[in-house]
Amino acid sequence: MEYFDMRKMSVNLWRNAAGETREICTFPPAKRDFYWRASIASIAANGEFSLFPGMERIVTLLEGGEMLLESADRFNHTLKPLQPFAFTADQVVKAKLTAGQMSMDFNIMTRLDVCKAKVRIAERTFTTFGSRGGVVFVINGAWQLGDKLLTTDQGACWFDGRHTLRLLQPQGKLLFSEINWLAGHSPDQVQ
């Protein structure tokens, strides 16, 4: 289990100067050729998402104005707050800030031939399904994960096991993603 606080994470500026990324975790850890990766991006200007051939991207708007995502003849989608949207990352996808204001989103990418992610929003205590990887990010409220207290802009990632996240206040929201490995694949096979 690895814990993080978004306010203390290192920031990587994009080459096109349209935004920045805070990498939460990758699997395998610290590998450039990853099977899955979670990150938080701040988008300050219209631009294109980076291409990642062979990957699926699920993007969830955390804050800021809605964002229009366009990919040639494949889709035109308005990304609304806390509504995950999936697309293959090998296509050119243009992002347009509809309100002209900066937005922040959660991204999870998985290798299409190895694993699949599911992103959800939780508003009550729950236990993960025992997948072989996952990430949680507190949108608001106070949540307990094991012996750790997680509050707004904090979270954790793990590479196996079941975990209970307990809401400690009457209201709260938490984004979570679990990684499921496709038949014939396992994180145990990774060197």
Curated annotation (Swiss-Prot):
The gene is ves. Belongs to the Ves family. NCBIfam families: PRK11396.1. HAMAP family: Ves. Gene3D superfamilies: Jelly Rolls. InterPro entries: RmlC-like_jellyroll (IPR014710), RmlC_Cupin_sf (IPR011051), Uncharacterised_HutD/Ves (IPR010282), Uncharacterised_Ves (IPR023482). Pfam families: HutD. This is Protein Ves. SUPFAM superfamilies: RmlC-like cupins.
